Amino acid sequence: MNLNATLFAQMVVFLVLAWFTMKFVWPPLINALDERSKKIADGLAAAEKGKAELEAAHKRVDQELAQARNDGQQRIADAEKRALAVADEIKTNAQAEAARIIAQAKAEAEQQIVKARETLRGEVAALAVKGAEQILKREVDQTAHAELLNQLKAEL
């Protein structure tokens, strides 16, 4: 093998090319690779952060939905309680009104009974006097008639 100046010149050119590449070409390539690596890492971190925020948002939405359901159920229960209370109040008022009407009707009936008794006493007394008059076949004077009526009323 013949080592001559060409081989030596090729080695010098290769070393110059390696030095030039290391000095001027390699740093921008490394920087570009580092920037790309950093962008990828930032993107992955942002994706993880977004995923965590999405999960947190889902949890908040689930909690708010559960709260809304609970509030709705509570409102329905309150409305049912109010409806039952109103129904009970209406029922109580109706019963009180019915009792009042019944008491009023009983009082009116009692008054009518008393009035009818008084009327009947008067009619019975008049009939008794008339019957007594017919039996005695004589005229009874007014004072005797009044006394007889009062006496018959008292007896009845």
Curated annotation (Swiss-Prot):
Its main location: membrane. Keywords: ATP synthesis, Cell inner membrane, Cell membrane, CF(0), Hydrogen ion transport, Ion transport, Membrane, Transmembrane, Transmembrane helix, Transport. CDD domains: ATP-synt_Fo_b. HAMAP family: ATP_synth_b_bprime. InterPro entries: ATP_synth_B-like_membr_sf, ATP_synth_b/b'su_bac/chlpt, ATP_synth_F0_bsu_bac, ATP_synthase_B_chain. This is ATP synthase subunit b. The chain crosses the membrane at residues 7-29. It is found in: Cell inner membrane. GO terms for molecular function: proton-transporting ATP synthase activity, rotational mechanism; proton-transporting ATPase activity, rotational mechanism. It comes from the Bacteria. F-type ATPases have 2 components, F(1) - the catalytic core - and F(0) - the membrane proton channel. F(1) has five subunits: alpha(3), beta(3), gamma(1), delta(1), epsilon(1). F(0) has three main subunits: a(1), b(2) and c(10-14). The alpha and beta chains form an alternating ring which encloses part of the gamma chain. F(1) is attached to F(0) by a central stalk formed by the gamma and epsilon chains, while a peripheral stalk is formed by the delta and b chains. It is a single-pass membrane protein. GO terms for cellular component: plasma membrane; proton-transporting ATP synthase complex. The lineage of its organism: Bacteria, Pseudomonadati, Pseudomonadota, Betaproteobacteria, Burkholderiales. F(1)F(0) ATP synthase produces ATP from ADP in the presence of a proton or sodium gradient. F-type ATPases consist of two structural domains, F(1) containing the extramembraneous catalytic core and F(0) containing the membrane proton channel, linked together by a central stalk and a peripheral stalk. During catalysis, ATP synthesis in the catalytic domain of F(1) is coupled via a rotary mechanism of the central stalk subunits to proton translocation. Component of the F(0) channel, it forms part of the peripheral stalk, linking F(1) to F(0). Belongs to the ATPase B chain family. It holds the Pfam family ATP-synt_B.
